[in-house]
């Protein structure tokens, strides 16, 4: 069961954002391998791989939540890339962050928009949408 969850989680993480999955592994594998495994199994293997939402809707919800936190830039970076990889547009993601200004505050929305600007520039440099 655990190996199945891990494999499913890694597949989901790599399908959403291959570079982000590698960054997560590099950041945690040596310093906190148990946390890394829990993130892969639970977040990606159990939750993000569920059939109830299509990947685009799931990523919009995730970007909304991470924007609202206001302090989850590494996770938001991953999910901005993932959202774009599954078909969200830059305009849609920008609108999501603007909506969060009402509910999470302008500073949280600004933090997300500043990060989105970086992510968009990185993707432009790579020729990605």
List each language-model region with its residue ranges.
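A general alpha-helix detector
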Residues: 12, 43, 78-79, 95-96
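Short acidic alpha-helix initiation/capping motifs at coil-to-helix transition points
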Residues: 37-40, 70-76
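Substrate/cofactor-recognition hotspot
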Residues: 59, 106-107
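A short structural micro-motif
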Residues: 67-68, 86, 99-106
């Amino acid at each position: 069961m655990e190996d199945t969850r891990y494999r499913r989680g890694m597949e989901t993480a790599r399908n959403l954002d291959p570079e982000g999955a590698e960054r997560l592994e590099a950041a945690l594998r040596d310093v906190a391998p148990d946390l890394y495994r829990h993130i892969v199994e639970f977040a990606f293997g159990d939750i993000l791989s569920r059939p109830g939402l299509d990947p685009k809707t799931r990523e919009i919800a995730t970007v909304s939540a991470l924007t609202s936190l206001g302090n989850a830039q590494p996770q938001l970076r991953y999910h901005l890339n993932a959202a774009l990889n599954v078909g969200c547009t830059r305009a849609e993601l920008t609108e999501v962050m603007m909506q969060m200004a009402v509910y999470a505050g302008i500073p949280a929305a600004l933090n997300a928009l500043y990060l989105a600007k970086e992510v968009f520039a990185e993707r432009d440099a790579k020729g990605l949408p």
